[in-house]
Design a protein with these regions (language model features):
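Short, structured beta-strand-loop surface elements
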Residues: 52-126
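Covalent nucleotidyltransferase core used to form phosphodiester bonds in nucleic acids
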Residues: 10-11, 45-49, 53-58
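Extreme N-terminal tail/first-helix region
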Residues: 1-20, 75
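Short helix-to-loop capping/linker segments positioned immediately adjacent to catalytic or ligand/cofactor-binding
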Residues: 9, 24-28, 111-117
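A generic local structural motif
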Residues: 6-9, 32-34, 52-54, 113-114
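Short, well-ordered beta-strand micro-motif
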Residues: 128-130
Length: 131
């Protein structure tokens, strides 16, 4: 399907937000919100998390998600937007890393270095969220 200008505007309500709430769904349909850093690039969002995080299992089972701008502790700062999420393949990680590094700079480097030191190699994954 061809991209339209509306696709690039889908996530406009998130612009300027430092955090978002990603809502994934259990197989029962129960919503599970999680606050995360994110970066937008080319009309898509990039996120990072631990490979073993519950949200990864949930989005693999049910790729339909909701995203909403939030503060650091998950208080919503706007309306939720429907979206689709998928775990990126390792060869796609560079796009996500570059977008997150561009947005968060040294904070991103410091945080991921500290978190990765406490986990085995390959335990960090990246997720792309599309309209």
């Amino acid at each position: 399907m061809a991209e339209t200008p509306a696709d690039h505007d889908h996530f406009a309500p998130l612009r300027g937000a430092e955090f978002l709430v990603l809502t994934t769904y259990r197989r029962t349909g129960e919503a599970v919100p999680t606050t995360l850093w994110f970066a937008e690039d080319g009309g898509v969002l990039y996120l990072t998390t631990a490979a073993q995080a519950g949200k990864v299992k949930r989005l693999r089972a049910t790729p339909a998600v909701q995203v909403a701008p939030s503060d650091r502790v998950g208080n919503l700062q706007g309306h939720s937007l429907p979206a689709q999420a998928r775990v990126l393949e390792p060869h796609e990680f560079a796009l996500a890393i570059a977008a997150l590094q561009q947005k968060y700079g040294e904070q991103f480097t410091t945080l991921t270095t500290q978190m990765d030191a406490a986990r085995p190699a390959g335990s960090r994954i990246y997720v792309v969220v599309t309209p």
